[in-house]
Amino acid sequence: MKASLLKKIYLSPLGMPIHLIQAFIGRVFRPFMVYGYYDKSQKRFRKYTRISSTALLSDNEHISIGDNCWIWHHSILDGSNGIRIGKGVQIGAWVGIFTHSSHIAIRLHGDNYLQVDRDDRVGYVRGSVTIGDYTFIGAGAKILPGVEIGSGCVISAGAMVTRDVPDHSIAAGSPAKVIGSTIDLDRGYLEIDGIREQYFNQDAV
C-alpha cells in the first residue's frame, strides 16, 4: 500500500522534484537507483527511466535515452561521439559503451599524443553507438565505437560487441556472434493470455 502510494506520487507532477531528491541521496548513499532522467539531447524528462547513482554518463549532452530504460550499477556510457538508446532498453551492471578509442593513436603519436588536438590525431577511432528498443545488454558486456544494435536483442553477459547486431538477435562471445533469435526465445510465452497483445513488436508475431 505504502509503495503504491509513493509510486502514485512519483507519477504525479511531483515526479521531477522526487527525481532530484533521489539523485542527491544517490550521490551520498551509493549504490542507489534514481528514478527519472533528464535527456539533455532531446530536452525531455524520462519519468519511467531508472539509472544507478554509480553509472557514469560522460558527455551526456550527446546521449539520448528513451523512456522505460534501466541502467544498473557501475556501467559506463561514453557519450563523446553520440549514443542513442531506444525505449525499454535494460543495461546490466559493469557494462561499457564506448564511442572512441585511442588504442592506435597512442603508438602513432608517442610522447606527442597530448600535444596533438583530438580531431587531428591519426588512428583515433570514433563512432556513435545505437541500441534499439527493448534490447537487453547483459552484465559486463562491452560495446565498441560505431556499433548499431537492433531492437529486441539480447547481448549476453560478458560479450564484446565489435560489429552491428540485427533486430531480434541473441549475441554472445568475444567478439560477439549471433547465436540465436529472440523471436524463437519468446515464441512459447506468446501463448500466455494477454502476452501476445503486449509484445513490443506486433509485426514480428
Can you say where each PLM-predicted feature lies in the sequence?
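Terminal amphipathic alpha-helical/low-complexity segments used for targeting or macromolecular assembly
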Residues: M1-S41, K47-Y48, G88, S101-R107, ...
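Extended beta-solenoid/beta-helix repeat architectures
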Residues: T49, C69-I71, E148-G150, V165
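Flexible, glycine/small-residue-enriched loop-and-beta-strand segment within the central core
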Residues: S53-S64, W70-P145, S174-P175, S181-I183
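General secondary-structure propensity
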Residues: A141, A159-M160
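Short beta-to-alpha loop/turn elements within the nucleotide-binding domains of ABC transporters
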Residues: V147, G158-A159, V165, S174
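A generic "structured core" feature
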Residues: V154-S156
